[in-house]
Curated annotation (Swiss-Prot):
This is UPF0325 protein VIBHAR_03240. It comes from Vibrio campbellii (strain ATCC BAA-1116). Belongs to the UPF0325 family. Pfam families: DUF3461. NCBIfam families: PRK13677.1 (NF010213).
Length: 127
C-alpha cells in the first residue's frame, strides 16, 4: 500500500504521526516522527537525506545564459505523497459541506434578524 515508505524500511506506516522537511545545502532532509509508545519519554523518529537534482535553466535566450537551479528529488516527492495520505485528514464529503453551508446560512439569518431588530429599535427612539 505504501511501497516507497516500505522501501525506506518503514514496515508499519500507521505508526507515523507527522513529518518535517527542510533543506540543507544541496540536500533535502526528511524527518519522520512516530507515535510515542507506552513507556517512552520521546517519540521515535528517523531521518533521511535526499540530494537535490541540479538543472540548468535558460535565463536569457538572447545571450544564451543558463542558471543552475535545484529541485526536489523525484523519489522524495513520492514518499511525501504517501506521508500526506497517512498524516493529512481525509477531505470532507459533499454532504458535510452541504450541512456546513446550511448551518452557516441559519446563523447568518439569526444575525441579520437581530441586526434588523436593533436598527428598528433605534428608529423608534428617534420618533
Amino acid at each position: 500500500m505504501y511501497p516507497h515508505l516500505t522501501g525506506l524500511g518503514i514496515h508499519d506506516p500507521k505508526q507515523i504521526e507527522r513529518y518535517s522537511l527542510r533543506q540543507e545545502a544541496h540536500k533535502d532532509v526528511l524527518k519522520i516522527y512516530f507515535h510515542k509508545q507506552k513507556g517512552e519519554f520521546f517519540a521515535k523518529s528517523v531521518k533521511f537525506k535526499y540530494p537535490r537534482q541540479v538543472k540548468s535553466v535558460l535565463v536569457d535566450s538572447g545571450s544564451h545564459k543558463y542558471k543552475e537551479v535545484t529541485e526536489i528529488n523525484r523519489n522524495l516527492t513520492l514518499v511525501i505523497d504517501e506521508l500526506n495520505k497517512i498524516t493529512k485528514p481525509a477531505k470532507t464529503t459533499e454532504v458535510d459541506v452541504k450541512e456546513k453551508i446550511l448551518s452557516d446560512l441559519r446563523h447568518l439569518e439569526k444575525v441579520v434578524s437581530s441586526k434588523i431588530a436593533e436598527i428598528e429599535a433605534d428608529l423608534e427612539k428617534l420618533k
